Amino acid sequence: TVNELSATWASAIVVEVETGRILAAAEAPTVDPNDPAAVPAADRGSRIFQAAFEPGSIMKAVSASMVLDTGTADEYDTVPAPDRMNLDFDDEYIKDSFSHEDFTLSLAGVLRYSSNTGMTNFASQIPRETRYEYLKKFGFGSVSPLRFEGESSGILHPASQWDEMTNLVTTFGQGISVTS
């Protein structure tokens, strides 16, 4: 529970997979609509619809679907997945969340190991504008059909505004934001 984990808040959503329809939503702390002043102002909205966050590794499944749908790779293709991938600009790098020897991974392997470098090597082969269009079709950067008062659309900048790092990190869930 929220109390057992000493969490500030929690949310849960039940979604119909085939349609994306929200069947149920719950969050804690809750607000008594008859006495909203009984809770701090920060807890009076709905974090499910208003609190934007980076999706992180769950985005790898979205990127993998783009890779397959565009024909960029199939289930047998592999890419290098080093522990750390140095980039050709600004002394930047992409790193996996755990130290490991260099891997050569299939798309399934990238998902299994949650490899940032592997997903970058797969999904960055897709032109950024194409990936942006897929993200829009998936609903990123948009409010839900519920049009909840004060709902955040999250952040999805147009592909033309992505710098080189954003172009890469969006493949594994950074550089964009979503709500629950």
Locate predicted features.
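Conserved, well-ordered alpha-helix/loop/beta-strand core segments that scaffold catalytic motifs
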Residues: 1-10
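Beta-lactam-recognizing serine transpeptidase/beta-lactamase-like catalytic domain environment
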Residues: 10-55, 62-180
